[in-house]
């Protein structure tokens, strides 16, 4: 199925502090990133792609247009998705990630805005985020191709092939050729190997006595 890149605006991250920032123990453990789609009508989200940068867990909330008469609501569509199996090691820290709509907890129709919530509980990393964020929506369906009738309805092997006008029946021709071949073999087998003697009549040859085989 085709997909189309959706133009988006990624706002600056907002850090939620953990601990007292006036001490060395205080550091941001949660980041919030809002993604808006200016001048884009509500759309069906197909895929989210990004490059991780030391984010251990990802949650996503989506603001959807429910109807024309009610206000849009925020819904959690992904909760604590693991990007780093061990937050204290490098595994998965800088991987490219693709998330599809079938992985979400809700329908991804009529999307107006996204909110990414990034968590990194390990104190080993000075910073974390997501990079190269791309949002895709479902593209137009490909038009169906019309196949020729002879491709759509192939002739069965059990059906006899149509005869061509003016040509003999192939099976009859084959039978006659087989009979002619058998007759030729019989004549060849009965042909004598004795040489025909000379016929001398009054010192000359009579051509009428020559045998043609």
Swiss-Prot record:
| UniProt tissue specificity | High expression level is found in brain, testis, liver and kidney. Weak expression in spleen, leukocytes, small intestin and colon.
The UniProt subunit note reads as follows: Part of the neuronal tubulin polyglutamylase complex which contains TPGS1, TPGS2, TTLL1, LRRC49 and NICN1.
A GO cellular component annotation here is: nucleoplasm
Q: Which organism is it from?
A: Mus musculus
What is the name listed in the Swiss-Prot or TrEMBL entry for this protein?
Nicolin-1
Instruction: Print the keywords alphabetically.
Output: Microtubule, Nucleus
This protein's major location comes to: nucleus
Looking at the keywords, is Nucleus present?
A: yes
The cellular location(s) given in this protein's UniProt record come to:
Nucleus
């Amino acid at each position: 199925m085709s997909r189309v890149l959706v133009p988006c605006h990624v706002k600056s991250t907002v850090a939620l502090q953990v601990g007292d920032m006036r001490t060395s123990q205080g550091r941001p453990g949660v980041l919030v990133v809002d993604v808006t789609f200016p001048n884009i009508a509500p759309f069906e989200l197909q895929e989210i792609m990004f490059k991780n940068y030391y984010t251990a867990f990802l949650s996503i909330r989506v603001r959807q247009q429910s109807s024309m008469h009610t206000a849009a609501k925020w819904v959690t569509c992904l909760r604590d998705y693991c990007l780093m199996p061990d937050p204290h090691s490098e595994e998965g820290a800088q991987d490219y990630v693709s998330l599809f709509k079938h992985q979400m907890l809700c329908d991804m129709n009529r999307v107006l805005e996204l909110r990414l919530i990034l968590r990194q509980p390990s104190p080993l990393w000075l910073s974390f985020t997501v990079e190269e964020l791309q949002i895709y929506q479902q593209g137009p369906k490909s038009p169906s191709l019309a196949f020729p009738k002879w491709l759509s309805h192939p002739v069965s092997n059990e059906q006899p092939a149509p005869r061509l006008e003016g040509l003999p029946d192939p099976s009859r021709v084959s039978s006659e050729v087989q009979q002619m071949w058998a007759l030729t073999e019989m004549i060849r087998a009965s042909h004598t190997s004795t040489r025909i003697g000379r016929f001398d009549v009054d010192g000359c040859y009579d051509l009428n006595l020559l045998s043609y085989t």
